[in-house]
Design a protein with these regions (language model features):
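Conserved PLP-binding catalytic core of the aspartate aminotransferase-like
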Residues: 273-274, 287-320, 342
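Conserved PLP-anchoring active-site segment centered on the Schiff-base-forming lysine
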Residues: 95-116
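PLP-dependent enzyme catalytic core of the Aspartate aminotransferase-like
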Residues: 167, 319-320, 331-363
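Active-site phosphate-binding strand-loop segment of PLP-dependent enzymes
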Residues: 123, 129-191
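Short loop-beta-helix segment that forms the pyridoxal 5′-phosphate
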Residues: 57, 69-91
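Conserved small-domain helix->loop->beta segment predominantly found in fold-type I
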Residues: 281-306, 326-335, 363
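PLP-dependent aminotransferase class I/II
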Residues: 38-39, 208-286, 290-293
Length: 363
């Protein structure tokens, strides 16, 4: 499968070239990772990790699995570690032999790519901008599940920040016990009360729900690729034999074990996002030319309305040293939508100031 359409944030050089701008240092708001950076606990052992690279990792990523077992008090049989949660998102439709997969759009493109790679047909279900990208109701999802044998749900969804109630997903799974609910919780730790949304600790675990979880975004470690899929032991046992060995490197395993010690980092990050998210949203609402949608996670989706070309905004911001995520490659977001991360207060203030300057320029 070609990677030509595998567009994502985190590549300002590509955007600088596309927009005809000179190469420069930028503040990257296009990726949704922790603004606190790598935890100090990981920085402190970084030189020691060099001694690990001449040794094989465990075959099945036990270091990463151990993090989930200790942090969330999970039975080891419920956890399958991966080279980031994306590896496991691709494994699942193939391992479960899904033939028709429902995907809520707009959402993370790899739900679609993984389903197509497994030979499945797609059923796209749209979140509507005119409804504020509100979560779909139970009756609509029942109709969807009647036609598909699996449903991918980002919770919270990227890029809309939509949150689906936990009980809704549990009720859906109970109503269709022979079909699969595949829940991507890559950003769940950024919510105000993640324990009220997450299914990772659900007891007893439904056999037809799988939860994908990532450590790379919350702990600012996207280059290491750390994640897992969590589910009923019988379901995980179906996936385990089909997952490639050695996919989690030894450094990632060692780092995962240290993340168990990062409770203070978790508290500081949660507090920061909880305070900055509503502040940034409210400030953008007051700037002409921007239509923000209420965020729940550590990122915000908005629409540029002062001109017909989103590139007018992107060029102004990038030329001033700030990279936003162009969302026009998401289904349903072609009409000048962009996404921005929630970062440190002073960084957010810089972006807000530039947005106001851009608005004044085009008014």
């Amino acid at each position: 499968m070609s990677n030509d359409n595998h567009v994502h944030g985190g590549d300002p050089r590509r955007e600088l070239k596309r927009l005809g701008l000179e190469t420069r240092d930028v503040l990257d708001f296009s990726v949704n990772v922790s603004p606190l950076g790598v935890p100090s606990e990981i920085k402190a052992i970084w030189k020691e990790l060099l001694a690990e690279v001449d040794r094989y990792p465990s075959v099945d990523g036990q270091g990463v699995a151990c993090y989930y077992q200790k942090r969330f008090n999970l039975d080891p049989a419920r956890v399958l570690a991966g080279n980031g949660s994306t590896e496991l998102i691709y494994l699942t439709p193939r391992a479960l032999e899904l033939r028709k997969v429902a995907v809520i759009t707009p959402s993370f493109h790899d739900y679609t790519r993984s389903s197509l790679a497994a030979g499945a047909d797609l059923l796209e279900v749209e979140l509507k901008a005119e409804e504020g990208f509100a979560p779909l109701g139970f009756d609509i999802l029942k109709e969807v599940m009647a036609e598909a044998d699996g449903l991918f749900v980002g919770n919270p969804n990227n890029p809309t920040s939509t949150v689906f109630p936990r009980q809704l997903l549990l009720d859906l799974a109970a109503s269709f016990p022979n079909k699969w609910i595949l829940v991507d919780e890559a950003f769940v730790q950024f919510l105000d009360q993640p324990e009220e949304v997450s299914l990772i600790r659900q007891e007893p675990p439904p056999e037809n729900i799988l939860v994908f979880h990532s450590l790379t975004k919350f702990f600012a470690l996207p280059g290491l690729r750390l994640g897992a899929v969590v589910g009923h032991p019988d379901t995980i046992s179906r996936l385990r034999p089909l997952k490639e060995p050695w996919s989690v490197n030894r450094v990632a395993e060692k780092v995962a074990l240290e993340l168990i010690k990062c409770a203070d980092y978790e508290k500081r990050l949660s507090s920061l996002v909880c305070l900055e998210r509503p502040r940034v949203f409210n400030r953008i609402q007051d700037i002409s030319g921007f239509q923000p949608f209420a965020p729940a996670a550590n990122f915000l989706l908005a629409r540029w309305t002062l001109t017909d070309q989103l590139d007018d905004l992107l060029r102004f911001m990038l030329g001033s040293g700030v990279h936003l995520r162009d969302c026009r490659n998401f289904p349903g977001l072609q009409d000048n939508f962009f996404r921005m991360a929630i970062r440190q207060p002073e960084e957010n203030d810089r972006v807000l100031s530039l947005m106001r300057s851009c608005s004044d320029h085009y008014l």
